[in-house]
């Protein structure tokens, strides 16, 4: 996934960077770095396991600890 695809996925899931980070078992800083422009020195390419999890979440999988917000399931 590209940095723009990761950000689009996070937004489609209705998650803040810290919430997606919790679901991926990483720090929020890591999510922000994966979403940053590849030309930035702090940009990070997501690990394969993270991409698989994001795709599973986009397909509708929700673990028991999925963030809950008012008006969102």
Task: Show the residue positions of the predicted features.
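The DNA-contacting recognition helix of HTH DNA-binding domains
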Residues: 17-18, 28
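Short, basic-rich loop-to-helix N-cap that marks the start of a DNA-contacting helix
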Residues: 38-55
